[in-house]
């Protein structure tokens, strides 16, 4: 798909997606209170995953790094540690999902990619919480270890499931709008009745999750 568009359009679209992802963080930062005092919930990884589904995992990583860097110097109080955490979180979710979708460019591939992305990102964040949170928060590691299952696991897994459901819900409408605006090349599968029925089922499942 990316081979059929100009580099200018690609850079423009990636910039737009990065700006939208940051706007999502900004809104969530002021509307959603932290969980357990420091765990922040946002859906920026939805936009980053969409960038990866359109352009590939490297583009998802680029958007993730840019968004995390801008977040660090504007609204985040976690500094370089938060920067690394946000990059790891976004890349483990969005890049893994995009890589699988790139290799299996079907609805099934997208679903599998998002599921694997949810699981891999959750696992990495649990390890991060166990290793880094005691240092960052200045609390005993045993205290953090006791929070892994009752606090960190449901929070992280729920966060990535939410992002995955939103990705499945809005990816197709966004891509369709971009193609109508001639910012993306048309796809021969857009008009396939079977694919439309599959997309309708995906929408219903995503809404149920939400």
Cite the ranges covered by each PLM segment:
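Loop-helix junctions at membrane interfaces
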Residues: 1-210
């Amino acid at each position: 798909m990316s081979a059929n568009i100009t580099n200018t359009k690609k850079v423009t679209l990636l910039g737009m997606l990065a700006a939208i992802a940051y706007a999502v963080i900004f809104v969530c930062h002021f509307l959603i209170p932290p969980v357990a005092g420091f765990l922040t919930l946002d859906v920026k990884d939805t936009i980053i995953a969409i960038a990866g589904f359109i352009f590939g995992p490297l583009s998802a990583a680029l958007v993730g790094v840019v968004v995390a860097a801008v977040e660090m110097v504007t609204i985040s109080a976690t500094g370089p540690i938060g920067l690394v955490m946000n990059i790891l979180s976004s890349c483990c979710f969005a890049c893994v999902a995009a890589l699988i979708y790139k290799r299996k460019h079907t609805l099934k591939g997208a679903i599998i990619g998002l599921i694997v992305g949810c699981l891999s990102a959750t696992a990495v964040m649990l390890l991060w919480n166990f290793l880094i949170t005691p240092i960052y928060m200045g609390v005993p590691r045993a205290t953090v270890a006791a929070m892994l299952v009752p606090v960190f696991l449901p929070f992280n897994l729920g966060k990535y499931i939410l992002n995955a459901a939103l990705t499945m819900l809005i990816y197709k409408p966004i891509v369709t709008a971009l193609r109508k605006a001639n910012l993306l090349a048309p796809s021969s599968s857009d008009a396939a009745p079977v694919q439309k029925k599959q997309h309708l089922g995906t929408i219903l499942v995503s809404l149920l999750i939400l």
